[in-house]
Amino acid sequence: MRPRLYLRVGDRVVHLRYHYWGEGVVIEERHSSLEGGFCLVKVLFEDGEERSFINDLDHECCCYYSGVRIVY
């Protein structure tokens, strides 16, 4: 089964619980070639830190469920 992805490279995001991180930009997507493997995104936030998140909406730890939201 293919993963349902939430974020794409270039998306601007914020985190609902960590507003002091500032706005972030998705700079990298990684997809596992193994069945059931992780789909990850790397986000560069305004505080200068890169943070990685699970990007599969079918996974209970998806970045959407942990508070990452797209800025439109």
Tell me what each language-model feature is.
Residues D47-Y72:
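Intrinsically disordered, low-complexity, charged/polar segments
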Residues R12-V14, K42:
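Residue-level detector of beta-strand face positions
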Residues W21-H31:
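Short beta-strand-centered aromatic/proline hotspots
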Residues H31-S32, G48:
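Short active-site-proximal "capping" loops at secondary-structure junctions
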